[in-house]
């Protein structure tokens, strides 16, 4: 598997990534096109296209924060799901980052959310905050009640949430 960092919104892969991003994530869970474009000029953000056998199979959007990496979005394109690629990507992340944090819908939201939580737990993540609120991306969108997961058990989560709120959603 290859991980190609995309450094420009004009990269041809971004069209496929952004299209899938808009189709997969509900409007309240995603950035506008302008906000997405700005990710590429932020030095803390890394957008990766994930390739398997020279095919784009998905992407990661990560934020390198003070003491952890925050995975804002992680998607395997629909035609490549259920092939264990997600677990391979998580394994790759573990090799590169000791502390990883991400958000997910509560498992009682629907069957897909329950599967997603199960996937993350099987891959070493645990729920560290089940009262987490994802701030809205802009005033026309809603904040969301999500779960915060990590691959380690911090004593407190306030500092994690504070940095996510101040850097990712500012």
Residues covered by each model-derived region:
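Short amphipathic alpha-helix that is part of the acyltransferase structural core
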Residues: 1-31, 145-146, 155-170
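Conserved acetyl-CoA-binding loop-helix of GNAT-fold acetyltransferases
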Residues: 76, 82-95
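Active-site rim helix/loop that mediates acceptor-substrate recognition in acyltransferases
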Residues: 24-52
